[in-house]
Amino acid sequence: MRFFRIFGSAMCLLAAASAAEIKIKVVDPQSAVVAGAQVVLLEVENSSHPVVELTSAEGLAIFRGIGSGPHQVRVLVPGFAAKTTTLSAAADPVTIQLRLAPASETVVVTATRTPVEASSAGADVATLNQQQLQIMNPVAADDALRFLPGAVVNTAGQRGGLSSLFVRGGNSNYNKVIVDGVSVTEPGGTIDLGTLSLAETSRLEFLRGAQSTLYGSDAMTSVVQVWTRNGSTPVPELRFGADAGNYGMENGYASLAGAHGRFDYNVFGNQFNTSGSGPNEDYSNSLEGADVGFSINDQMSVRLRARHDNSVTETPGAWNFNGQNIFHIGGVTYVLSPDLGARARQNNMLASLDLAVKTGSNWTHHFAGFEYNLKTSNIDSGISPENTPFGPINTPFEALVNINRAGFDYQGDYVERTWAETTIGYEFEDENGSVNDPTFALGGHGLRLNEAAYAQQALTLGRLSVIAGGRFVHNTTFGNTGVPRVALGFQALRGGHILSGTRLNFSYATGIKEPRFEETFVTGQFQLPNLNLKAERNRAFEAGFQQNLLGRFVLVANYYNNLFHDQIEFVTVNPTTFLGQYVNLQKSLAHGAEVELQSRLTQRLSWNTSYTYTSTQILLAPPGSFPPNAQGDPLLRRPRHSATTLLTYLGPRWGGNLGGSFVGPRPDSDFDGFGINHTPGYFLLDIGGWYKVSSRVQVYANAENVLNHFYEEVTGYPALGANFRAGMRFRIGGE
């Protein structure tokens, strides 16, 4: 009996020795801990079965019951380069420091809903990390997006003006915008990017192409996703600052963030005001938010996020067309001036609760509940009426929108092998809202209960990578439909010193967009509702290559082709009473090419530049359509030629950037009979930078449109001339 006790004890000691515990600590280039990093551990002798953990609020990933090694560790953190290292033996915390990298090597999450290197994502993704956003200091999302490849931003006027995004020839409501995991677009894709604050944003990703397989309705040509910064310091860190500039610009902000044990938090607020450059151009925006996370145990964590945003914009309307506000037509002189009685207000509230559960060594589940409420009002008192060849404008109106989106999401990620990963998901959403204009007795209330299920398989088979997925959608308005997507990548040349890798890419996808509430449910004197509208669709494919050069440069070139059909347009059904309704009648084509050069000249200096060519045409228009919306016409506000450049330096004592955006001439219209049919091209140059006075004090400055060019992104709405802001940031605590 004694022999068996000794033998059993020996076996237990042997098992304990062979089942080691490995701790991995992940830090960023400034040595700050990184929470939520995906750490994949492999036994070198059995590399086909990975074990996956996420780092805690303290930046630690702990692997228990692991063999004695050797092991290989791979760390994937969005916004940084993937990091792979080999551990010769189990050790106490092994610190892995991340680094910045060219865009193609940066880890992204939007393309596949899981962390993946951009070069293997099967889609084109541009990113802005926290350091870049801090230098750019954007007032709103449109200020940052206009310097990213393939993005054409059209803002109607100055700060707070209605701002739209056009990607690959698609409409402005063909983009899905997600904040902290919650869609912030109205049903049908409408969003104002000019009022979407990026205060306390840790990362922005801009994904181009049809992405409805993973993201559902509205992701017809792109997805924009932003995340709030998490707290990461054991000692609470208070950040606050303010800046001011010309045109009455004033900006103040503060945040309190930190992490202790299993708990992390960030509570923040921001206030921005400006008087603009002319009459009735004031704008103010206030933002409050919180991001709180708690690790219940090593296998389960929960995160609560909330944001409230309130903005007021004075809207002078279209009055200066390409520098001209006096027109002589038919012997009549028309003098246009700003509308002094119009303003827009927006109030929105976002909340989400995400539960992450890890089961087994390679299954991760996310259960999320969310709610988003949006209230907008566009009011014109009519105190500035003006005549046009088509009649008076600036007549009184009151457009009111109240939208609520609430629902539940599930996402499961299974890493079955080093070369295979599966993602599955289910979504339920309740869309409830009303659209009204009491002035014209126009309005309606709508309710949709939508469901969707999706699956995606990612495979790496030698030099070939395959990402294939599908989504089944049930929508109350347009019924059931399927949405497939497949992306192929082939490593044609692994390369040497000069040509350090050649990759060929191809993808085919479909996109869908549900009708807007005002298209489906609204009724009035001149409009009938249409409860039988179909989804707008996009058949999209793209093909291109990625070429690495000298280990510092990456050349990316793609051809894209989008065929939009079942597009919704308003059609008059009774010419006598002018009664009409929205119907699925339009079809259009957009195709072109994108060329991008990504480079990391040094570890601290990066430079990205891009050129986009876009050709569009209306293939089928509703009966009675006339220019500029007739069959054969190009789509409005889509330039044939556009280009961007962004040079960024990030050093220990100072940082700076230089951003340029060129947008060529594009078709447009005044819609009032003045004969305006285009908007001239323009070049916009912005600069920004900061200097560290001490470890706790920074001074910074930003200048936009430094060349002081007169330009309009939307005809009739002059943009700001040269404008600047300067201020100081302070930090207390945070060790």
State what each model feature region is.
Residues V312-E314, A318-I329, N432-G433, G443-G444, ...:
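Surface-exposed extracellular loop regions of Gram-negative outer-membrane beta-barrel proteins
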Residues D142-S183, S202:
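Extracytoplasmic beta-strand/coil segments of soluble accessory domains associated
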Residues T460-V466, Y559-L563, V583-D670, L707:
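Gram-negative outer-membrane beta-barrel transporters
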Residues N246-N273, G278-P316, L340-F367, E416-T422:
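Transmembrane beta-barrel wall of Gram-negative outer-membrane proteins
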Residues H328-K358, V401, R448, R503, ...:
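Outer-membrane beta-barrel signature, preferentially recognizing the C-terminal barrel domain
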Residues V182-A210, W227:
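Short acidic/polar hinge/loop motifs at secondary-structure boundaries
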Residues S255, F294-I296, P634-E735:
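Conserved C-terminal beta-signal and adjacent last beta-strands/turns
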